[in-house]
């Protein structure tokens, strides 16, 4: 698949187009231009390194939404074996914006749950662009209860603009479904490892991200609102999205510094979409390390650790004013 370049990547796109053109010429010519191709390839690689070393939060937001970025099912196929998808919330419907099922990770039985956006127009519509309805969150909760019953660790993958705000979703109890998931995940008797792989949009993300370990991919985002939504409220214009992204502090490095996530998983040069298999290998190592941390831990110790972790959020210290 041909790589889609974002607006700020146009200098890289122009170099790559030139390299592709030279390769095409070389195939039909007796002239050896391999040295020139190699020179331009190195130049493109260095340009990518320089560009990605100085990304703004708004640019990171664009990468997190890249249409070729790996989604949950892509990671499932690379990281897990014997995946058996489970459907429905046993109450209303099967929401395809959340996928989940039984699988094996490095030989260990587990439960996998995650948002799924879809690649083409038809699939995006079927999966509601990765925006779950209440039945999606209730399906996730049902699968978590199954995992708890059989003592299976839970891996969740977060990638959503947010919970679906439609009238039908509200009528069926969207806020209740999200709130109930937060409650359930806080007291589950099995390890939970959450990874933000793309967009982490507000409560729609949090509903499957209350975990013992929360990781973020290097160019993913996690915030209470999208930059465009924030800009529309504060500045009455979505054009202020870059400023809003800066103010929201939605990048992995910012959230790690604040103690809101536990680990950042580095991405291949140019982002996960440039090397999905390489990204999967890096993520496999990080997930394995996290799982080993909880193996052998008693249920009481696991829940106590999770409780203390959650209670540590938002802590503050009162001080007396200086005279």
Curated annotation (Swiss-Prot):
Its UniProt entry gives the catalysed reaction(s) as: N(6)-carboxybiotinyl-L-lysyl-[protein] + acetyl-CoA = N(6)-biotinyl-L-lysyl-[protein] + malonyl-CoA
Task: Provide the GO MF annotations for this entry.
Answer: acetyl-CoA carboxylase activity; ATP binding; carboxyl- or carbamoyltransferase activity
Instruction: Give the record's GO CC terms.
Output: acetyl-CoA carboxylase complex
Q: Where in the cell is it found?
A: Cytoplasm
Q: What class of enzyme is it?
A: transferase
InterPro entries, per the entry: Acetyl_CoA_COase_a_su, ClpP/crotonase-like_dom_sf, COA_CT_C
Catalytic activity, EC: 2.1.3.15
What pathway annotation does it carry? Lipid metabolism; malonyl-CoA biosynthesis; malonyl-CoA from acetyl-CoA: step 1/1
The protein's UniProt keywords, in alphabetical order, are: ATP-binding, Cytoplasm, Fatty acid biosynthesis, Fatty acid metabolism, Lipid biosynthesis, Lipid metabolism, Nucleotide-binding, Transferase
**Is Ion transport given among the entry's keywords?**
no
Domain CoA carboxyltransferase C-terminal spans what residues?
A: 39-293
Where does this chain mainly localize?
cytoplasm
Query: What biological processes does GO assign it?
Result: fatty acid biosynthetic process; malonyl-CoA biosynthetic process
The Swiss-Prot or TrEMBL record describes its family as follows: Belongs to the AccA family.
Q: How does it assemble?
A: Acetyl-CoA carboxylase is a heterohexamer composed of biotin carboxyl carrier protein (AccB), biotin carboxylase (AccC) and two subunits each of ACCase subunit alpha (AccA) and ACCase subunit beta (AccD).
Entry function:
Component of the acetyl coenzyme A carboxylase (ACC) complex. First, biotin carboxylase catalyzes the carboxylation of biotin on its carrier protein (BCCP) and then the CO(2) group is transferred by the carboxyltransferase to acetyl-CoA to form malonyl-CoA.
The name on file for this protein is: Acetyl-coenzyme A carboxylase carboxyl transferase subunit alpha
Which species expresses this protein natively?
Burkholderia mallei (strain ATCC 23344)
